[in-house]
Amino acid sequence: MSKKILRYTGTFAAVLGLFWTLLILTSLIPNGQIKKNLQKSEEFYKSAEAFSFEQGQKMHTVSDNYADAILLNILWNIDSKQPVLTSLDTKYCDGGDYGVNWGLHQALNGKKANCDYSRYWHGSVIFLRPLLLITDVQGIKNIGLAAVLLLAVCNLLLLLKKKQYFVAVSVAISLLCVHIWDVRLSLEYLPAFLVSLTMCLLFLGLEKKGDDTLMMLSVVSGVSIAFFDFLTSETLAILLPLILVVLVRWQDGRLGTFPENIRWLVRCVCCWGISYVMTFLVKWTAASVATGENKFHSAIQSAGVRFAGTSQEENLPLFKQIPYAVFANISTLFGGEGRVDFGKILIGLLIVLLIFGGGYYLLHGKEKQKDVTRTVLVLGAVPYLRYLILNNHSYLHEFFTYRAQAVTIIALCAVVWCNRESQLFRGKTQSSKAKSSKMQGTKNASAKKKGGRR
């Protein structure tokens, strides 16, 4: 046991150390070399709203220009002369009453950063600074979308190579349902899918090596998503790979009982969760040591708001916000045109009931696949638990947190597929068997007649 813990700790330290080293190295790129493309990007954000709709009033088409302006602002305030310190003590210019878009303009024109944002690692800077040498933010978004789609295709090809046709189709359906093409709308939407789809490739490629390997990969996943993501749909980084492994093992006849499945899944999720939290703790500790300031206070205060804060702009009490956090994410999944569009929720749930409920009714057999069904339903329910726990964050930012429901969609597809045995299929099979028996009987009778003539 102690050797395993040592191995997991070593993996955690190695991965985080690698990422931090890359962050420092890319921070050495002089700001003068990226200023031109940053100024082009700033021109775009100068005329953009903090949160803009790209298609009518549909919430899933919201561009989070607010977060992007802050990220570019932080990127600019990382000093190549002090890469270690400024990669930890991340700050931005808030722009005062004119907002963060104006703050980015001020930062590029010499104003010092005045707002601390050291609670995140801002790991995407590793890619953004080099890319800003060749293109502006719009080009980076297109490159990011291309990378996400390429990783998705690689996952589908790997599943097809393994003859996991249903799993490949369910992944494709889930990505379409969460509007995968819309991740191009904001820089902050990209990392969660880049990390999650990369981890899917690793989990699928190495899952036969055993559960210990999956736990090790879970550590890698926890570090990666904490380092690169902005708390968008972080649960995808562990739930998506795990549900794919569950379905692949079931189709190969290697999946255990429900209690057995829960045991190794809980271990993987715990490894992921511990490494996720520890990645943040290392950042706050390192930033506190480097600056001599207590970075824990603001970070923990911010975390508390996401757990139990309430929306001041909508004056929503906590008891109402908790269920509304779930409603908002379901609403956005179904194309809601407001934070909570009950009309779209009702229509969407009816469609889900017709498709999945009807599919299950028509295709299910007498023998229920209880172990795999319970397992995938547990995984599919986790995103809603996240929405309830981080209710303030999930309610206010449902336009990107809703994408975590991709796992739920795969789970629903799996419930129908894994329990299939339709009367129609069985009828055809029985008919074929009867026809085959009849033909065999005719052949035997014919042979007997011929034998009799002899």
Predicted regions and their residues:
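Aromatic- and kink-enriched transmembrane "portal" helix at the membrane-lumen/periplasm boundary
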Residues: 126, 172-194, 222-227
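Transmembrane-helix signature of polytopic, lipid-linked glycan biosynthesis machinery
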Residues: 178-181, 226, 380-400
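Transmembrane-helix motifs of polytopic, lipid-linked glycan transferases
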Residues: 145-169
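Membrane-lumen/periplasm interface segments of specific transmembrane helices
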Residues: 26, 262-353
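Membrane-interface helix-loop-helix junctions at transmembrane boundaries of multi-pass membrane enzymes
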Residues: 357-381
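Hydrophobic/aromatic-rich transmembrane helices and adjacent perimembrane loops
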Residues: 396-418
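Juxtamembrane segments of multi-pass membrane glycosylation machinery
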Residues: 126-144
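Membrane-interface alpha helices of multi-pass inner-membrane proteins
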Residues: 215-242, 264-277
